[in-house]
């Protein structure tokens, strides 16, 4: 159940990766890649202050405010062989414990090695086997062939294209991708 993971988020493992919540000690690994402009090419913006100075991500700007438990899942992608955080994958904007959005980023030096596909597959499997979420969805700029390919390889279905829509901070054409629990279960049964 989703409610089982409101405060403590799990660590997931794949053959090459660990997916775990980020901790302040990860700031050095994050600093090496998180502010690189090529990550945000299709987002229409540069890296934010928190992305340029990742240690700020771990400081609560209003510690006196009581926070609600966070239903979102935000994992750092850790390469086992180096123990470095090389990216992140998130399931966020969870609505009514039924559906959520998918996002991911990776160190540009490691693009093309299948790490995001491996991480996203693990995240999707966790969501559909341990929570009641029934749908995951994502958007990707039509020009971002690598991101669109990741979603396709993970079983997401192209549901349509928005023309001249706003995605993050830019107006562009972007694809909408979706994956239903029943489609994922059917895909798992045939592989």
Language model: regions and residue ranges:
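Conserved acetyl-CoA-binding loop of GNAT-fold acetyltransferases
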Residues: 152-162
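Conserved acetyl-CoA-binding loop-helix of GNAT-fold acetyltransferases
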Residues: 104-106, 112-129, 145-153
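Short histidine
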Residues: 140, 147, 159, 171-173
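GNAT-family acyltransferases
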Residues: 1-109, 130, 164-191
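Short, Lys/Arg-enriched C-terminal cap helix and immediately downstream tail that follows
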Residues: 135, 163-164
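Conserved GNAT acetyl-CoA-binding A-motif
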Residues: 130-139
